[in-house]
Amino acid sequence: MKKLLLLTISILICVSMSAQNPPITPAWAFEHVAWEDSINTADGAKALVDGYLERNIPVGAVIIDSPWSTTYNDFNWDTQRYSDPKDMINYFKSKDVKVLLWLTGAVNIKCKDTRFQKSDTYDEVVSKGYGINQGKPHVWWKGEGVHIDFTNKEAVAWWYKQLDKVFIDGVYGWKVDQGEFWFGDILDTSIGQMSNEQFRPYYYDAMYDYTVKKNPQGIIIARPYSHQGGYAASVEKMNMGWCGDFSGDWKGLKLQIQNIYQSAKRGYGSPGCEVAGFFMKRSNKEQFVRYAQFGCMTACMINGGENGAFSNHLPWWHGTDVENIYRYCVVLHDELIPYLFSTVVDAHLHGGSLIKNASYEEESHQVGDYLFTKAITSADNRVSFHLPSEGEWINFYDGTKYAPGSLIEEVYALERFPLFVKAGAILPLNVTSGLTGLGDASMVGRKTIMIYPNGTATRQLHLPCGDGIEYEDCLVTYDEKTGKLKVSSGTSQKYTFILKNMPSVKKVKNVASWKYNAEKQELRIDVEGSTLDIEIR
């Protein structure tokens, strides 16, 4: 009986731990997000996205921020701003850009900047008891209204029907903004009084549940930890984090880093970065670049805001050099998506975050197990920091090797930032061009895996099968001493392996083709199959 009790307790603990693991973030959601919250029209959103695409800066999604509806959260498009919403959504769909819509959980009687003041659903919400605090209106940052009681199942079902009006093909989720924070420290709900903090998961969980049920590739962008109110969304029901709001100066960047690190330590899987902040002070040239470089080493680069959406937030506004740097950051981040995705799947299965080993003091962190970066947060490009205490680390740019825990003191030109790869790394990539130097256009459509040999290295990769959350496991092992590279996966795939720091290569067996670059000490192997046994001599 005692053994049975211990087994039961053990199972309950495991279930509890599993329930706190973050969800899998769809592969597409790691892509660059443009955020239009300035002009707030269809033309403005199109101009923003097209501005990037015309300059060969990839965009994966666009946030349509408020006011896009006739009153907040009535889910009726304001056709004076967006004359043909379906046409706009299809326009973005034709460019493979997904649409995300802003919302909060409040229904207003007075609005700040919408076409109408009172929502056409306000009276219904109050009369049916769908609001918290007995349906009494309260002033919040977008006017005055009542907040939906997400503890009330009937209210949630009604809310979902409202969402159905706009959650159509091409719309992939929501920027779930903060409204509940303004409705009091203690709230009256359908299940009794509770603190504001206790109420928040009901709101964010409801939005997550609706979204992924309607579209398994859908996301909510929501606050994990924020200095504006603490923890918000549930760890297990938030697939993209945004800690907002921040200023665009050094102070804002430093504060955002602290927020992101706090979120990661809590176990949020995919904290992203609000590049150049959202409000108050605007980024100058140096601040914008350092923001982008830090952002590309988080889950997502989310760029836009009211502090210069069509000026300081645009890389080309700062000059051609910044445009080139920003393009590099976005493309590098895109190339890393299979690695980011695989790391977040690990976090989903075992707990943890994409961002690991974060140091508040040195403003540094690991991206997964194999990459390390340090943010530059001042106009002084000279930085001092320590590499992680475990493993040998390799400078991403020049291949210089460093012992564990090494102190790095270096001046970084604007186009460079501290980035290191752990020896023994096995990095799945999606390389489509030669922009970053990791590969070239011949790798399009292939599973590219980069290996930094260090004794015997093995990694179970979770490779995305498309844009969503589906993946296939692929076990990769490389033995530096024997020169054997083994791969085991469920289906046959076209692979390109890039092995770094290879002093010499004379022969490679059991592959379609191989090429050795003696100057770069780099070996490229092209091969196809599900079970591979490659010999390198």
Predicted features and spans:
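Generic recognition of long tandem-repeat/solenoid scaffolds
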Residues: K481-S489, K515-E528
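Catalytic-domain carbohydrate-binding cleft regions of carbohydrate-active enzymes
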Residues: S18-R416
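Bacterial Sec-dependent N-terminal signal peptides
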Residues: M1-A19
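Accessory, solvent-exposed terminal regions and/or long lumenal/extracellular loops of proteins
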Residues: A423-V511
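C-terminal beta-strand-rich structural cap/linker in extracellular carbohydrate-active enzymes
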Residues: G405-I451, A518-R537
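Secondary-structure transition/turn motif
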Residues: P388-S389, S488-Q493, D526-L532
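Solvent-exposed beta-hairpin/edge-strand motifs
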Residues: H386-D398, I498-S513
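Residues that act as N-cap/strand-start positions at coil-to-secondary-structure junctions
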Residues: A379, A413, G468-E472, T491-Q493, ...
